[in-house]
């Protein structure tokens, strides 16, 4: 998996957007340059059954048009039905071992918020981890306590190689700190889905992240030049 996929990672479902606006919000985000999309259709108002499948196919069509990977949150049957690019699992969802057996060659992401969760997870079987919540968030009813940037740094110290995306109460202003903490990108829900102008909000995120990555790469390049003149 190319870790660039995690730079601006949008997570959304119909309950995260104004009624009837979900596909419009998604397309605006795709047009503005998100690097990955996770379809997370949950909650009492979320679609189920045939309606959810139909929407997932529409989502997949849009993601394919913009050449952006589509990850399905937790729903194994849906991910298999549409042959999604991957699946994202929480700590209480299907085991990673089973998921890898069901989805050979697909992208598997895992939510990891603490050292204990990291140590108890088969990290070698996942392609990336979603770490957080960094800050308190209203987007998930069952969100764990916030870990802060320090928590993000601690998770990165446990494994310097695993691709990691930060999530939880984040916005464009956090791009620099997220990268400094060791994450490869930023995952958002409401920063885009609740924005008055989803395209503009996404563009600010994308441009901010790209500018920071460019700056970080330049700093690393200068270090190498000084080390090997």
Swiss-Prot record:
Pathway: Cofactor biosynthesis; thiamine diphosphate biosynthesis; thiamine phosphate from 4-amino-2-methyl-5-diphosphomethylpyrimidine and 4-methyl-5-(2-phosphoethyl)-thiazole: step 1/1. Its cofactor is Mg(2+). GO terms for biological process: thiamine biosynthetic process; thiamine diphosphate biosynthetic process. Belongs to the thiamine-phosphate synthase family. It comes from the Bacteria. GO terms for molecular function: magnesium ion binding; thiamine-phosphate diphosphorylase activity. It catalyses: 2-[(2R,5Z)-2-carboxy-4-methylthiazol-5(2H)-ylidene]ethyl phosphate + 4-amino-2-methyl-5-(diphosphooxymethyl)pyrimidine + 2 H(+) = thiamine phosphate + CO2 + diphosphate; 2-(2-carboxy-4-methylthiazol-5-yl)ethyl phosphate + 4-amino-2-methyl-5-(diphosphooxymethyl)pyrimidine + 2 H(+) = thiamine phosphate + CO2 + diphosphate; 4-methyl-5-(2-phosphooxyethyl)-thiazole + 4-amino-2-methyl-5-(diphosphooxymethyl)pyrimidine + H(+) = thiamine phosphate + diphosphate. This is Thiamine-phosphate synthase. NCBIfam families: thiE (TIGR00693). One of its GO terms (cellular component) is cytoplasm. 4-amino-2-methyl-5-(diphosphooxymethyl)pyrimidine binds at residues 38-42, 73, 111, 140. InterPro entries: Aldolase_TIM, ThiamineP_synth_sf, ThiamineP_synth_TenI, TMP_synthase. It comes from Streptococcus suis (strain 98HAH33). It is an enzyme of class 2 (transferase). Condenses 4-methyl-5-(beta-hydroxyethyl)thiazole monophosphate (THZ-P) and 2-methyl-4-amino-5-hydroxymethyl pyrimidine pyrophosphate (HMP-PP) to form thiamine monophosphate (TMP). Keywords: Magnesium, Metal-binding, Thiamine biosynthesis, Transferase. PANTHER family: THIAMINE-PHOSPHATE PYROPHOSPHORYLASE, THIAMINE-PHOSPHATE SYNTHASE. Its EC number is 2.5.1.3. Transmembrane segments: none annotated. Mg(2+) binds at residues 74, 93. Binds 1 Mg(2+) ion per subunit. 2-[(2R,5Z)-2-carboxy-4-methylthiazol-5(2H)-ylidene]ethyl phosphate binds at residues 137-139, 169, 189-190.
């Amino acid at each position: 998996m190319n870790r660039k996929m995690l730079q601006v990672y949008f997570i959304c479902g119909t309950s995260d957007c104004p009624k009837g606006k979900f596909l419009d919000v998604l397309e605006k985000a795709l047009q503005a340059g998100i690097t990955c999309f996770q379809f997370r259709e949950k909650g009492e108002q979320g679609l189920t059954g045939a309606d959810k499948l139909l929407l997932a196919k529409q989502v997949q069509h849009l993601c394919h048009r913009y050449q952006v990977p589509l990850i399905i949150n937790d729903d194994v049957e849906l991910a298999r039905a549409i042959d999604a690019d991957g699946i994202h699992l929480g700590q209480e969802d299907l085991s990673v071992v089973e998921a890898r057996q069901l989805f050979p060659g697909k992208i598997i992401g895992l939510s990891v918020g603490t050292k204990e969760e990291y140590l108890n997870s088969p990290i070698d079987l996942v392609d990336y981890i979603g770490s957080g919540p960094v800050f308190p968030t209203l987007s998930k009813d069952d969100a764990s306590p916030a870990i802060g940037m320090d928590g993000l740094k601690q998770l990165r110290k446990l494994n310097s190689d695993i691709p990691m995306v930060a999530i939880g109460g984040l916005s464009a202003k956090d791009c620099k700190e997220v990268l400094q903490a060791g994450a490869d990108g930023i995952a958002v829900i409401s920063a885009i889905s609740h924005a008055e102008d989803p395209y503009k909000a996404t563009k600010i995120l994308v441009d901010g992240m790209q500018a920071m990555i460019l700056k970080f790469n330049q700093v690393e390049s200068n270090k190498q030049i000084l080390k090997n003149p």
